Amino acid sequence: KIGYAGEEVGLPLALTWAQVEPGLPDIGVAASLEASRFATGEVRRVLLDPDRLLLPECEWEEAPRRCRIWCDSDAEFEELAAGLVERGILEEVDEDIADAMVLRDSLGRPLLAGMFGVEKPKDEPVLRDGVPWPVLRLIFNLVPPNATLKDFDADIRDLPSQGQFGALALLDRGIFLISSRDRQCCFYIWRVPLSWRKLLFVNRVVVRDGRRKRLALTVVGMGLKPAVTITQHLHRNILR
């Protein structure tokens, strides 16, 4: 696959906390902004009630009901989960409560997300036991819940496409200046309302103090179908 800058993007990689942590927002920044507070109109209504995007099951796309979490060992996953919970990107929910919350199909199968990493080639490698390892971008594989959601373009429907700029006509001495900047970690700073949890449980259980806990994403996950629409709207509102 080809990335944003035309570079080749590799296959999914197994996650380790040491490789993921450098690419995440700091504690106190991650999951620190309530998305619904900055949203208005159609986007705010969807944030408060994700059922507005939910399709009838007969219209769901063909997709797996659960996806793999890419970690090479239970110990690696436990460390990763603990770090993400500490930052507020994931939260632990008692399994019996999670089982009642999670979105299921008509056969009773829960829809559960996966997780994997993609190399961030421009970041300095991290050292593990003296060996350099690439920093990984944390990706949530949200194919199962995405298959249940309508398309939602909202604010992005009026963004210009690159081809439209070719139709601009300038005077002889006219200059058209465009600037842009990557918004690092922008998905993981926005916390979504509790009503979204049913769509955002991941395919893994942890045990804390003898109790089984299901992990749920609390933020606008990179890979969520309406993620770009939501974050574009939120940043536009901030700049107004």
Regions found by a protein language model. Name each.
Residues 238-240:
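Short, intrinsically disordered, charge-balanced linker/junction segments flanking boundaries
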Residues 1-87, 91-92, 164-165:
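Non-catalytic, polymerase-adjacent accessory regions of viral genome-replication enzymes
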